[in-house]
Amino acid sequence: MTNSSVFDSLAGSKTVSKTLFDAASSARALVRARTTERARARAEHQNPAMIHDSGFAQSWLFTGPPGSGRSVAAKVFAATLVCSNPDVVGCGQCEDCRAAMGGSHPDIEHIVPQQLSIGVDAAREVIKAAAVSPVAGNWRVVIFENADRLTMQAANALLKTVEEPTEST
């Protein structure tokens, strides 16, 4: 973990790095379990069972005061999830890590509303982004900044998506 350049972006925050590394490792285990379960189910001509007990939470909330690194932590976590290096979580060297850290990965949507109060339309934009299946990897990641500015109606509209995201989001 310490040699991984995506984690180097989290200056001096070993606790956050370890938490995100562990979560990304759980996500990889979940993908392997789903793949194995689907292969077994196909071999047995059954419907694949959903794997839920992986220890990986599909919705994350990064909190802290402005300037505390929330956006950087979210970007690093997104990079670890889309990293294509099978041996190193968040290697920072593969094309997917570089694209994620550079803000151009097709499976990462970064939404930064500029309004002081974020309404239902912006919440619907997040919901639509979360419903899209990943195109390059195993996970679709939506980073939605300034969620503390959501109106009550917008927060309610977004709640179900946050509580019950699609399988690979």
PLM features: what roles do these ranges have?
Residues M1-Q153:
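P-loop/Walker A NTP-binding region and its immediately flanking N-terminal helices
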